[in-house]
Amino acid sequence: MNGVINEIEPTGQEAADRRHPPVINRVQFPSAGHDEIKVGEMLFEGSRENASHQATYGATKAAEATKKTLTGTGDGTATAFNFDFGEVVPGSVKIVTNDSTAKEVTDNGDGTLGGESESGTGTVDYATGHISVTFTAAPANTKTVTATAIPGAGFVGIANDALDASEDDGVNVVLHGTICEGIAKYNGSAASEEQLKFLSRHGIW
């Protein structure tokens, strides 16, 4: 079985480990003008398809990916909030309030929530998308608590080769199969252990 679909021949280093034939496809970006895409970058659905509608989905880095949003409401006393997203991408969770002094709790990428703001702590189960957060101070009455995350269903694949997205409108993507050890990246940095587990759940090892 030939696992390569509509691939354009890469000119440099590849992400795919071809000892186990991967499934690779050419995927359109949602629009031009993004930063450079590195080999091994985890790619996700963007906010829209390309103008020609030749692609059924777009691909972009996590920073520009389409995110799912859930909300809760403060009552002035409650500090603990729970959200259920379904599978989410490790490292993508953020929870904020619209208090006069906004509170923000971010994803540490290891199943815990916190970040640098010290606004609160919590946990996230990436496979189920269950999120529990406890703020250090209760959000004010009627103020909104907004949780955002990249849904697991929005994952497209791994960039098989590097490109300048300001000049190119698409990228060769590893959709399934083995990739070279240490090549996977999330927003330009080496993928974490939880992100590698996420890739494994989606058929990329």
Where are these regions (language model features)?
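Extended beta-strand solenoid/passenger and fiber regions
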Residues: 24, 59-121, 126-150, 184
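Surface-exposed, low-hydrophobicity beta-strand/loop segments enriched in small/polar/acidic residues
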Residues: 1-66, 71, 132-134, 140, ...
